[in-house]
Amino acid sequence: MKKTIMASSLAVALGVTGYAAGTGHQAHAAEVNVDQAHLVDLAHNHQDQLNAAPIKDGAYDIHFVKDGFQYNFTSNGTTWSWSYEAANGQTAGFSNVAGADYTTSYNQGSNVQSVSYNAQSSNSNVEAVSAPTYHNYSTSTTSSSVRLSNGNTAGATGSSAAQIMAQRTGVPASTWAAIIARESNGQVNAYNPSGASGLFQTMPGWGPTNTVDQQINAAVKAYKAQGLGAWGF
């Protein structure tokens, strides 16, 4: 997803301190007081706010890793961009904001939607930038639906399981949906010769996987013992 819009003096109030535009200073999350949880929530659930305005005035360059995802927020004081991607490099969301016109394009399950917007600008030579298709999977802002570059999805059952996992672990449902899509393509009865099985492809030591509830319980046990590292994050 790639968007362009004229930079505004409005900013999402995040309690982030930084440097004025033009200083060229690049601040990482460790250098400033960044509300990481709020930035994560904006990236997953309030992308319209991130596209409407930078997270603060002036130039900034903020990067951090949380719950298996790398988050990036940058601005040169005039244009701004944000993105988040899985630790293994699969891009989950991306926005590059600059100029006056923008075109939004993203995948939501199997449906492709587009939104266009035109704003007044003092720059008469700004061109709209359309969304590229290089990202490996995209998430909608209203569900945990995920589609990988190879076509894998979490499916309806997997998306429901991802929501339950989010409630039981505190890890975003979109993360669990991505894991399910990658590990089993949303197939409840998926089995690997290594012994891994179910939506989450857990090993027998974490418990039986005959039902979806058992698969969720096994995944919770694996997460509590090893975190997202149990799935390579």
From Swiss-Prot:
Q: Where in the cell is it found?
A: Secreted
What is the superkingdom listed in this entry's lineage? Bacteria
One Gene Ontology molecular-function label: hydrolase activity, acting on glycosyl bonds
Keywords, sorted A to Z: Glycosidase, Hydrolase, Secreted, Signal
Q: Which residues form the signal peptide?
A: 1-29
Q: Name one Pfam family in it.
A: SLT
Its GO CC terms?
extracellular region
Enzyme Commission number(s) of this protein? 3.2.-.-
Keyword Hydrolase listed: yes
Task performed by this protein: Is able to cleave peptidoglycan.
Family, as annotated: Belongs to the transglycosylase family. IsaA subfamily.
What's the protein name?
Probable transglycosylase IsaA
Its source organism is Staphylococcus aureus (strain MRSA252)
Q: Which gene encodes it?
A: isaA
